Amino acid sequence: MVQAELRGDMPGVTTNAEFCERLRRRLLAQPEKTLLRVTVAPDFERPIEFTAKALLDRAEELASSFGITKERSVVLVLLPHSPELFLLQLGLVLKGHIPAILAWPTSRVDPEKYKCNLVHQLNHLPADLLITLPRLAENLAGSLPYPACGMSLANGASFEKIFPAAPVSERLGNRKSPKRNGCPNPDALFLQFSGGTTGAQKAVVVTAGMLAHQLKQLGEVLQLSDADVVVSWLPLYHDMGLIACYWLPLWHGAASVQIAANDWVINPELLLKYAARYKATFCWLPNFSFSYLSQRGEQMQKHSLGSVRAWINCSEPVRCKSVAEFATTFAGRGVKKESLQASYAMAETVFAITQSEPGRELASVPRSCVSHENRACGELAFDLIDDVYVSSGKPLPDTEIKIIAVDGSKCPDFAPGEIHVRTPSLFSGYWGAEGFQTHSLNGGWHATGDFGFIAEGELFVIGRFKDIVIVGGNNIFPEDVEAVVNSVAGIHAGRVVAFGVEDQEFGTQGLAVVAEMKGEFNEDAALQLETTIRKLVLTVIGTAARYVSVVPQRWIVKSTAGKISRRETRERFLRDRFSPG
């Protein structure tokens, strides 16, 4: 029965009830199989384990313990990595409620920025209940138009250990969060937040039909089965962690091993250790994670990684240097070039839009070939570090992609433009202060705001459309500049931002680069690095950088999802450089 459903022989899922019933049947087909392992500090040797039956029972039991009587309640969940967090996400869905997991702060997020983002969400997201740690719930009591319920965790996590400063409730002031008015959607399963870094993250309404379609199609492309194991350090408030690393294996009866993001940052070897111990077959990672592991590779060569069929880079764009270094560093531990895979994804389509072909090396296109006709894709050239654009794979079944030029015309192969997508898993709107707001689509097509091109049916993502820097009529992609600067010795790789600064005198933009220095900051060394960066950018990119600023570590602004915020970093740069005084 389960395998028939996976092959698509069973009718599709359209309602919440159908989804939950189908999920229960799938999981109870192997009730004693260990499906979920959650690591809890400090005892990393003994993850908390749940069999399929125990997972279902504990999840529903925990969700029921809050005594939520209102049907289809929107429940905000603000908890750190813990078994309870995974149980709540599943249990609230099974009980017919609509969970929304809010970002828990990591050790690398600026406390003030995090508090501002949290206050904005509490001020603008209609809900019926907030579940969080006891002290924080007490702190918020009276500041929200809905209850804040405290929940103690087995690992004794504390909000105050991370942010002992002013209470969040003081930031709310007298402004009440919007009252709950209606249901996001009759078949909404949960809300997930867009991973954008340009302003407040939006709550995407994910329905039963959207999720079921995504899980079925992605599972088929990856040839996922109940024999597979996913290992992850990605948080549940991010679509990669929530969909690819939790719901996808659950739906297909596969196991998953979940590591806290904070623990992984401190000890990246945990990911490889658990991949080897549990013979993981899939692992999703952003660009910086591949580099982060490669840079520490010499100390992590004792783990056998040959079981992993796919290390999937889910970034826009995929960086050749990131995957190449990872493949080279861990080749002796069983990592094959063909296991390096890629995907293009976003919360607005639940998750994946494209996926590279398993077992085949990533395709690439030399940068010089873009906009040229009759050029063929080749296998990823591992010796051409970032002289190529790397494929994010082909569209999932039933998913369409087209590239649109500025004038609205459809671009031919190899010609870059804005990426538009149409798929059955595409969202219909956001949930916010005004309730459910329908997202306008043009003939069912969603304009992603990303810039890229198609070659031989595969998608190549270049970057964000609005981030392009126009210098003297030439289009400069900031991601290209960042890739060049990341290679400079003394610069913290992955902590570089390029953007445009308006030049009213010349009627164009000037190229600006901000890069964090590796190690302790030194002004003389920073000046030398700035000179090196200017020369390298001019040589490789062919455009002079008007402004180059080498800064101390953690100067660059990141979102709560851990992504560099180009907009906020640019604003900080402009304030520091051009503000009077």
Where are these predicted regions, by residue range?
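Conserved pre-ATP/AMP-binding loop-to-beta segment of ANL
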Residues: 31-34, 170-200, 214, 220-229
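Conserved AMP-binding/adenylation subdomain of ANL enzymes
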Residues: 212-229, 239-281, 296-300
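Gly/Ser/Thr-rich phosphate-binding loop
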Residues: 280-284, 296-386, 400, 408
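AMP-binding/adenylate-forming catalytic core of the ANL superfamily
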Residues: 276, 283, 423, 428-429, ...
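Conserved C-terminal "lid"/linker of ANL adenylate-forming enzymes
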Residues: 495-502, 512-513, 534-581
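Conserved ATP-binding/catalytic segment of the ANL
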Residues: 390-402, 406-414, 418-478
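Conserved AMP-binding A3 loop
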Residues: 46-55, 189-213
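Conserved AMP-binding/adenylate-forming
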Residues: 63-109, 233-236, 475
